[in-house]
């Protein structure tokens, strides 16, 4: 019979397969590159505003707790039935709870109403901690609104007792349900919520760790307390 011959043993296939390998790899890489453009990355902002009142305390801001659907970089859309989907074409600059923690710290710093603010991992000695839960951070349809809801508790860092608690909610209209408009609306709503949180904390009566310099100047038995230089305190 005329025509091309067929390899008769397994070893006869090695040469042709070796010649095909580079072409197969190139085809796979080409397919991966043509899957679509990379999503646009969006950040959240930290608003700046002068806030009256000052608590003068040291605050630690913990990363908000969140359900798995919110512990993501994806932009979430929720319809009237409660069904959740992820909006294509965009993503957040970091895992959402961690990004919100950073921007809330920045908002406190921008307001300049707190003596010091940092993360628990900083090792700073604090008067209180802000423990929070991210409840909602999504685009609601068909109303086309950005919805943000955060539950915040002020906790005495010396004994773990809850000093106060409040739920903060904010909404912002969204022109259309696409990545750019969704990110803009959620950033606007979060800015409102974060400013409300800073005002609330700054205006609250909060516990403070005992300041050694502010303790009584006498020891038990009436002995005068002296500083390290041996002189009575001023």
Model-flagged regions — what are they?
Residues 1-31:
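Sec-dependent bacterial lipoprotein signal peptides
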Residues 33-97, 126, 204-234:
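A structural "domain/chain start" motif
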Residues 66, 70-73, 152-154, 180-184:
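Juxtamembrane/interfacial segments around transmembrane helices
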Residues 82-91, 158-199:
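Short secondary-structure boundary motifs at beta->alpha junctions and helix caps
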Residues 97, 101, 105, 111, ...:
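Extracytoplasmic/secreted envelope proteins and their assembly/folding machinery
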Residues 111, 115, 197-200, 204, ...:
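Solvent-exposed amphipathic alpha-helical surface segments
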């Amino acid at each position: 019979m005329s025509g091309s011959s067929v390899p008769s043993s397994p070893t006869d296939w090695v040469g042709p397969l070796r010649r095909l390998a580079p072409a197969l790899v190139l085809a796979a890489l080409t397919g991966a590159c043509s899957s679509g453009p990379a999503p646009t990355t969006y950040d959240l902002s930290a608003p700046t505003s002068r806030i009256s009142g000052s608590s003068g305390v040291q605050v630690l801001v913990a990363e908000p707790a969140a359900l798995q659907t919110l512990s993501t970089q994806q932009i979430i859309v929720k319809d009237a039935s409660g069904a959740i989907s992820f909006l294509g074409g965009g993503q957040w600059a970091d895992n959402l709870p961690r990004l919100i923690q950073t921007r809330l710290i920045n908002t406190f710093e921008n307001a300049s109403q707190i003596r010091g603010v940092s993360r628990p991992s900083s090792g700073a000695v604090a008067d209180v901690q802000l423990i929070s839960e991210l409840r909602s951070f999504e685009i609601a349809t068909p109303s086309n609104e950005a919805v943000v809801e955060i539950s915040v508790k002020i906790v005495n860092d010396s004994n773990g007792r809850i000093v106060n608690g409040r739920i903060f909610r904010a909404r912002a209209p969204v022109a259309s349900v696409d990545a750019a408009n969704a990110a803009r609306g959620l950033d606007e709503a979060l800015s409102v919520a974060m400013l409300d949180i800073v005002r609330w904390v700054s205006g609250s009566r909060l516990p403070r760790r005992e300041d050694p310099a502010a303790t009584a100047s006498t020891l038990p038995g009436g002995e005068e307390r002296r500083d390290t230089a041996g002189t009575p305190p001023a």
